[in-house]
Each structure stands twice: as structure tokens, then as C-alpha cells.
């Protein structure tokens, strides 16, 4: 610990980059504890041999990823970071540059598929870093000297159903439900189910879309803080499961791992809804740093980088 305390800024930067590179690569190889547990629960609930075989293939894939030290899905996604950083965290000014360097290193050590294509030029950068990518979402925490960072790998399949729109106010919450069902029944089968469905409700599309993605960061089993919101989550989850999309879209007892709603106060004349989905290989991971750049992995119990 004393050595960490006495590190100069460049040593802190290099330590942070190294940890985040390893953690980003790790995210592509191991599902978070809650997702792994939920898949086991869903497998038990299946009544058909085909559905059980699909789940068994998923677990075999996870086993091989561990044994071979390789990503669990060939599509390692576009890297996104959701950063909650204290105003007194020593590297607050360096985080963006450090994360870009971490992605370059993670691409090599993962290895991660090259998924950053520059718009208009249609050129793959070859290192998963490009204009505004990795995407970094910021939350500033006053009077804190710690940082908490979520890593999210946004694959092509699970990003496909993503959408947002502003509803007419008279459509109300039933309009929200219809919007979600129309999108999942149209595109959910192609997004590698069972899905985690994130819904954002707000007054404008950009806020609703952002909240829908943040809803995917919540641990499975958590509920919206408002009882009415929690009830709507349960209603939508039950309805989507009744469609029986099943694992891999091949039919089964469940379509989703869960439904999470996040909301912001809205304008009286508008109700905007955003939708994001996570596939069965929901690669979402969380890590916390103290001011000495020592880390704790939150999402994967006992993980050591």
C-alpha cells in the first residue's frame, strides 16, 4: 500500500491503464455472477429438449471460454464505459485518455474483434478506438476520491432492437408497453435471447435512450425504486415471456432474463420511451478504484486481474 501511495502520476496512469485493459478483456470472457445464475434458473424452467440443448450449448461455450482463455462470443462489441468518478479522484483529468489506451491494449490481450468503423470513411480502425469510441458516459460524484466504472460490450445483435421515440401523451403507459412489445416481437428473435430489456421513460428521446442503456447496468433481480415502476417491469416481463421466444429464438418458456425501467421526470405534453437490449451473453462488468488506484471487482466475485 505504501508503494501505491508514493506512486507519481505517470505510475498511477500506467497502473490504471493496465488494470482497465485486463478488466476490459476479462469482461469479454466471463459473464457477471447475476447473469450466469439467471441463465441456470431459466434452463431449469424449460420443458422441451430443444430449449435445454440451447442452454447447454451456452454453458459449454462459457466453459470453453474459460479453458481456452478466449472471449465467450466472437462479437466483442463496441466498448462502452459508464464512469462514476469523484471530484477528488487523482486521475479524473486522465480517465478518457487512459481508457482509450486501455481499449487498445485489451484488443491485443483479449483478443477483441475489431469493431470500430469510422462513419462516412467506412474504415475499420483495427484497435476498437475511433471517434467518440470507446463511448464514455460520465457521472461526477462530489467530495469523493473513488471511481466506479462499468464496462459494457455492445454487440451488433443485442444493439439491433434499440430504438426510441416520443409518444403522444394520451398513449400513456399502455403506449410504452405497446412500443416495447412491437419492437421485441419484431427484432428480439435476432438479438440472441433470452434478453435483458432496458426501458427508459422521460420527456425527450435522448434522455429516454440513455436511461434505457443505464437500465441494463442494474443487477438482475433489482426493481425500479417506484412501486408502480416495479409493477410495470413485472407486467412487461410476464407478457414478453408469454410470447415464448425461448433461448436462441427457437421457442421456450422464457423470452427475457429480466425487464428494467429507469425514468426521469417528463414534460406534461410528452412521454418518450427508449429501448435497449442485452443478449444472453450480457457482458456487463463493474470495478471500483480507490485513490491509490487499488481495485475491487464488483460484478464477478473473487475475480483477480
Predicted feature residues:
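Non-transmembrane, aqueous-exposed alpha-helical and coiled segments at domain scale
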Residues: 2-199, 204-305
Amino acid at each position: 500500500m505504501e508503494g501505491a501511495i508514493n506512486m507519481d502520476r505517470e505510475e498511477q496512469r500506467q497502473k490504471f491503464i493496465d488494470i482497465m485493459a485486463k478488466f476490459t478483456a476479462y469482461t469479454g470472457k466471463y459473464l457477471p455472477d447475476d447473469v450466469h445464475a439467471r441463465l441456470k434458473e431459466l434452463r431449469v424452467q424449460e420443458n422441451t429438449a430443444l430449449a435445454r440443448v440451447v442452454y447447454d450449448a451456452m454453458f459449454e461455450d462459457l466453459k470453453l471460454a474459460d479453458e481456452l482463455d478466449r472471449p465467450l462470443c466472437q462479437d466483442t462489441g463496441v466498448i462502452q464505459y459508464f464512469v462514476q468518478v469523484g471530484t477528488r479522484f487523482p486521475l479524473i483529468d486522465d480517465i478518457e485518455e487512459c481508457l482509450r489506451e486501455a481499449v487498445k491494449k485489451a484488443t491485443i490481450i483479449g483478443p477483441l474483434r475489431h469493431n470500430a468503423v469510422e462513419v462516412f470513411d467506412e474504415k475499420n480502425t483495427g484497435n476498437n478506438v475511433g471517434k467518440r469510441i470507446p463511448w464514455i458516459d460520465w457521472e461526477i460524484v462530489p467530495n469523493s476520491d473513488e471511481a466506479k466504472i462499468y464496462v459494457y460490450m455492445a454487440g451488433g445483435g443485442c444493439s439491433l432492437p434499440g430504438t426510441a421515440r416520443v409518444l403522444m401523451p394520451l398513449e400513456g403507459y399502455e403506449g410504452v408497453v405497446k412500443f416495447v412489445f412491437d419492437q421485441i416481437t419484431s427484432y428480439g428473435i435476432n438479438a440472441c435471447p433470452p434478453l435483458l430489456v432496458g426501458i427508459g421513460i422521460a420527456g425527450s428521446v435522448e434522455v429516454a435512450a440513455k436511461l434505457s442503456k443505464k437500465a441494463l447496468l442494474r443487477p438482475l433481480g433489482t426493481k425500479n425504486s417506484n412501486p408502480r415502476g416495479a409493477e410495470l417491469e413485472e407486467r412487461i416481463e410476464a407478457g414478453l415471456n408469454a410470447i415464448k421466444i425461448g433461448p436462441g429464438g427457437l421457442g421456450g418458456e422464457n423470452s427475457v432474463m429480466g425487464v428494467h425501467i429507469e425514468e426521469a421526470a417528463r414534460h406534461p405534453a410528452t412521454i418518450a420511451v427508449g429501448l435497449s437490449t442485452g443478449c444472453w451473453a450480457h457482458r456487463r462488468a463493474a470495478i471500483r478504484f480507490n485513490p491509490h488506484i487499488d481495485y475491487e471487482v464488483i460484478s464477478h466475485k473473487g475475480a483477480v486481474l
